[in-house]
């Protein structure tokens, strides 16, 4: 029997003391993965917050940009035109654009359909003709368009007068810069 004690146990099963599946390495990997995912989530939230904040700041500065910030008068005129074209017309200015009946002969326009809604004009239908380019549209279509933009949807010509240069201004200095032609 003494020999049996000194001999290696050949009869012992190989899986008598199995290592647990979730060993130290697996726990270490899971902890690292959680930390990495949490860091990525925080970075994503920070990037989205920064993006939103910058968009708000840009939107506010675009609204309140004044001509005093631009030193060159020609750049001021171009910037004002772009700014005004991006903001749209006020309802009072919109009412100044003439409305006529299609097919009455009074309106000088060659189009047979509204290029905003792609609907055909019918005789007796109210049509608004833009003064600078003579493009005509259904009244409700062009009113919706002009409340958000102040340019013709067909040719993109601005409906606003550009601000005169400081040298061209006479004694009569008006606050109203934007007017409908």
From Swiss-Prot:
| Family matches, as Pfam families | zf-RING_2
Q: Which GO terms describe its cellular component?
A: membrane
Tell me if Transmembrane helix is a UniProt keyword of this record. yes
Cross-referenced InterPro entries: ATL10/ATL72-79-like, Znf_RING, Znf_RING/FYVE/PHD
Its GO biological process annotations read:
protein ubiquitination
Give the subcellular location.
Answer: Membrane
Query: Which stretches are zinc fingers (RING-type)?
Result: 114-156
EC no. given is: 2.3.2.27
Keyword terms of this UniProt record: Membrane, Metal-binding, Transferase, Transmembrane, Transmembrane helix, Ubl conjugation pathway, Zinc, Zinc-finger
Record field: transmembrane: 34-54
Query: Which Gene3D superfamilies does its entry note?
Result: Zinc/RING finger domain, C3HC4 (zinc finger)
Highest rank taxon of the organism: Eukaryota
MF GO annotations: transferase activity; zinc ion binding
Pathway assignment reads: Protein modification; protein ubiquitination
EC main class here is transferase
Is Metal-binding found in the keyword set? yes
Q: Which reaction does it catalyse?
A: S-ubiquitinyl-[E2 ubiquitin-conjugating enzyme]-L-cysteine + [acceptor protein]-L-lysine = [E2 ubiquitin-conjugating enzyme]-L-cysteine + N(6)-ubiquitinyl-[acceptor protein]-L-lysine
Q: How does it sit in the membrane?
A: Single-pass membrane protein
Which family, according to the similarity comment? Belongs to the RING-type zinc finger family. ATL subfamily.
Q: What is known of its domains?
A: The RING-type zinc finger domain mediates binding to an E2 ubiquitin-conjugating enzyme.
Would you tell me the protein name for this molecule?
RING-H2 finger protein ATL72
């Amino acid at each position: 029997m003494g020999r049996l004690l000194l001999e290696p146990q050949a009869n012992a099963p190989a899986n008598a003391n199995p290592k647990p599946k979730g060993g130290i390495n697996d726990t270490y990997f899971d902890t690292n993965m959680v930390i990495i995912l949490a860091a990525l989530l925080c970075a994503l939230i920070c990037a989205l917050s920064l993006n939103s904040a910058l968009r708000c700041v840009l939107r506010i500065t675009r609204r309140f940009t004044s001509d005093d910030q631009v030193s060159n008068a020609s750049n001021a005129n171009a910037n004002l035109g772009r700014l005004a074209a991006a903001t749209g017309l006020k309802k009072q200015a919109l009412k100044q654009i003439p409305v006529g009946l299609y097919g009455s002969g009074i309106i000088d326009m060659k189009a047979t359909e509204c290029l905003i809604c792609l609907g055909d004009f019918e005789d007796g239908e109210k049509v608004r003709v833009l003064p600078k380019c003579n493009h005509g549209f259904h009244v409700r279509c062009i009113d919706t368009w002009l409340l958000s933009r102040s340019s013709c949807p067909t040719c993109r010509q601005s409906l606003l007068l550009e601000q005169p240069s400081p040298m061209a201004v006479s004694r009569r200095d008006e606050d109203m810069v934007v007017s409908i032609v």
